[in-house]
């Protein structure tokens, strides 16, 4: 008696589990999920509340440097970039703006717990702007001279810093 050869796997079943099919399936699922999360409303309703009051800036230069490097998160005059409407990035951008406004908002000057006394120190220590902000907003990149000028102006406007 001759040994019967093992049946060959059909081409259809081999193709079903090929790496290319897996990659196509995974890509389809990822695209579907990316489309589905666009319907989550958080992060798309970009609201800039009215400006209630601003601090008495020590100079127009300090204000201009602040607007350029800080105001998107620390004022009610946020310029919302196109990617702030695409989830999940919109969720992160909205969270950063909400947190920034809650911590320090120059558009609601005089509100309780809204002093800028540590603003100069935060910039001087390199904590602000956040590490990922400048690559996405090149206009916010300050030269060393501009950074020093901003720190001096923030100290003059709000007090605080290392010179107190």
Could you tell me what each predicted segment is?
Residues 126-127, 134-162:
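C-terminal capping alpha-helices of c-type cytochrome domains
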Residues 1-18:
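N-terminal Lys/Arg-rich, disordered targeting/topogenic segments
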Residues 17-25:
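N-terminal membrane topogenic signal
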Residues 91-137:
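Extracytoplasmic electron-transfer domains, predominantly the class I c-type cytochrome c fold
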Residues 45-66:
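Electrostatic cytochrome c docking/interface patches
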Residues 66-78, 128, 150:
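The canonical Cys-X-X-Cys-His
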Residues 80-95:
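Acidic helix-start/capping segments at beta-turn-to-alpha-helix junctions
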Residues 24-41:
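Hydrophobic membrane-insertion alpha-helices, especially the h-region
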């Amino acid at each position: 008696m001759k040994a019967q050869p093992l049946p060959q796997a059909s081409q259809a079943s081999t193709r079903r589990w090929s790496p290319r099919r897996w990659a196509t399936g995974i890509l389809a699922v990822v695209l579907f999920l990316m489309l589905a999360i666009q319907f989550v409303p958080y992060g798309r309703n970009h609201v800039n509340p009215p400006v209630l009051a601003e601090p008495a800036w020590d100079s127009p230069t300090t204000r201009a440097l602040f607007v350029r490097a800080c105001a998107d998160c620390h004022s009610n005059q946020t310029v919302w970039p196109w990617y702030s409407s695409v989830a999940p990035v919109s969720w992160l951008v909205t969270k950063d703006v909400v947190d920034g406004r809650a911590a320090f908002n120059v558009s609601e000057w005089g509100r309780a717990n809204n002093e800028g006394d540590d603003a100069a120190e935060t910039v001087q220590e390199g904590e602000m702007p956040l590490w990922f902000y400048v690559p996405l907003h090149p206009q916010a990149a300050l030269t060393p001279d501009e950074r020093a000028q901003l720190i001096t102006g923030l100290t003059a406007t709000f007090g605080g810093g290392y010179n107190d």
